[in-house]
Design a protein with these regions (language model features):
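C-terminal segments
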Residues: 239-250
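Alpha/beta enzyme core
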Residues: 2-83, 87-228, 232-240
Length: 251
């Protein structure tokens, strides 16, 4: 079993390749084990998928529940894991930094902090201060913990691409290791973002269906995630199987 430090170095090298590696999103221990066995080199948690596995909605998970979930996934897998850490479970920059330190203790090697509070977008200055605090906390850790900064404006329909790019550039300057703007819906937008920043970029692929990994790699995208889509596929399949069982009486 690789150590946390070894996993962190592996995770860092995956991003440095800028070769659009897929990082699927498990929602529980079983799905994490399945995805590792399938051959993926790293995993990313999904806040929505985890919440729904507990019968709740996205954003209804406590910090302690999130940390326990991350500890579980780390304990049943041997590959790097990064975490959808939502808003860092705090509004205050200092508290976000403290929570990043707690997150690292679960065995994961990265995490994301977004500029959405679950009710409103943080203003530009506050959003940057939060990323800076998270980056400072990450830098103090004994491993190369990779901090992803998320600009949520497209996903929440509160900002245009120019606003997103301004935030991503500021997050990069504040110390983020990876940049992420969920909601980019075409390759032109992805290319525009890549042309404005220098840090590795994550793309959420369900917004760009039918586009190959190779096409993203040619642009220089570092990482591809699927969010809660895999969890959604499993839930849909379960519903269809259940309906068939009730309708036909045959399994």
């Amino acid at each position: 079993m690789p150590t946390q430090s070894e996993k962190a170095e592996i995770f860092k090298s995956l991003h440095e390749a800028r070769d659009a590696f897929f990082i699927p999103n498990p929602w529980d221990g079983g799905s994490a084990v399945t995805l590792e066995k399938a051959g993926f080199k790293a995993l990313a948690t999904t806040s929505a998928g985890f919440a729904r596995s507990l019968g709740r909605e996205d954003g209804e998970i406590s910090l302690d529940e999130k940390l326990a979930h991350c500890q579980l996934l780390s304990s049943v897998t041997s590959i790097p894991i990064t975490v959808d850490f939502e808003n860092g479970f705090a509004d205050d920059p200092g508290e976000v930094g403290a929570n990043i330190a707690r997150l690292s203790e679960t065995g994961v090697v990265g995490g994301s902090v977004e500029d959405w509070s679950r009710t409103v977008m943080y203003d530009f200055t506050h959003a940057v201060e939060r990323v800076a605090a998270a980056a400072e906390a990450s830098a103090r850790l004994p491993i190369p913990f990779m901090l992803t900064a998320r600009a949520e404006g497209l996903l929440r329909k509160t900002g245009d691409l120019d606003d997103i790019i301004n935030r991503l550039k500021a997050f990069e300057a504040a110390g983020a290791d990876v940049l992420y703007a969920p909601g980019l819906a075409n390759l032109e937008g992805v290319a525009t973002v890549l042309g404005e920043v220098s840090k590795p970029v994550n793309v959420l692929t369900p917004f760009l269906p039918g586009i190959s990994r190779e096409a993203f790699a040619e642009l220089g995208v570092a990482r591809l995630s699927v969010g809660a889509a895999l969890a959604g596929h499993v839930t849909k399949a379960l519903g269809e199987a259940a309906e068939n069982l009730l309708t036909t009486g045959i399994f």
